[in-house]
């Protein structure tokens, strides 16, 4: 499977989850440096926004757009996942007044990108995650899955929100 980065093909590996699948198990590092996993979000809908780095324009914009769109939804968690260290993600949220977001890093668990089918195998971003959004209901069943074809593009916000 491939995506593009600045219109150049980049191969990705792993199996990208599909609508109707159960959300794959994961263990990520939270902002407080403690582990986060599926059980921490039991009974909540999850919008998992996966991206290369919070310090890129499209990644930061998508976090802000989703945070604003989900601000009033107490039944939904916005889980932002990248290779960024938790310190960088916390800094971003403080500097940009982003709240109600759960930041998580796969820096301790690089196999996350394979398990979720977003591992960039080549090019300048090799080892980071492709841009994707996966929405799961309160039972852990996927209701939306989008692997963004061009890494520098934003996800389809309308489809994300309609899937909740």
From Swiss-Prot:
Homodimer. This is Thiol peroxidase. The active site is at residue 59. Residues 17-164 form the Thioredoxin domain. It holds the Pfam family Redoxin. It is an enzyme of class 1 (oxidoreductase). GO terms for molecular function: thioredoxin peroxidase activity. Keywords: Antioxidant, Disulfide bond, Oxidoreductase, Peroxidase, Redox-active center. Thiol-specific peroxidase that catalyzes the reduction of hydrogen peroxide and organic hydroperoxides to water and alcohols, respectively. Plays a role in cell protection against oxidative stress by detoxifying peroxides. InterPro entries: Redoxin (IPR013740), Thioredoxin-like_sf (IPR036249), Thioredoxin_domain (IPR013766), TPX (IPR002065), Tpx_CS (IPR018219), Tpx_Peroxidase_subfamily (IPR050455). Transmembrane segments: none annotated. It comes from Vibrio cholerae serotype O1 (strain ATCC 39541 / Classical Ogawa 395 / O395). Gene3D superfamilies: Glutaredoxin (3.40.30.10). The active site is a conserved redox-active cysteine residue, the peroxidatic cysteine (C(P)), which makes the nucleophilic attack on the peroxide substrate. The peroxide oxidizes the C(P)-SH to cysteine sulfenic acid (C(P)-SOH), which then reacts with another cysteine residue, the resolving cysteine (C(R)), to form a disulfide bridge. The disulfide is subsequently reduced by an appropriate electron donor to complete the catalytic cycle. In this atypical 2-Cys peroxiredoxin, C(R) is present in the same subunit to form an intramolecular disulfide. The keyword Cytoplasm does not apply. It catalyses: a hydroperoxide + [thioredoxin]-dithiol = an alcohol + [thioredoxin]-disulfide + H2O. Disulfide bonds join 59-93.
